[in-house]
Amino acid sequence: MSRRQQRVEELIRREIAQMLLRGELRDPRLSPASAVSITGVGVSGDLSVARVYVDVLTESLRRDDVLDALVSGAGVIRTKLGERLQLRRMPELRFEADQSITRGARVEEILSELRDSGELE
């Protein structure tokens, strides 16, 4: 992965996270915005596509609803990114669920249960 790809990924991740925190995306499915986490961004080699990985940190929001809201607002998000970032061509945004945080928490829960039962030393 090139240095430029990494820089573009980080810029897109940071800007989308800021949009969510500032409430710039006026969709009730994204509220509270602090519960929506942009866990990562991956851009294609030609910078034409950016995969944005999203996780929901609370039970009050449904992951599918959040993804639907982001997909339906992808055009607005892309336009706002175009205004803020100095890129020749703004990548197409594709939002995907990132369940790594949820899976990690589940592994921790299982390990804790095993420690409590004495099966894990």
For the regions a language model picked out, list residue spans one by one.
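Charge-rich, low-complexity N-terminal segments
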Residues: 1-49, 55-121
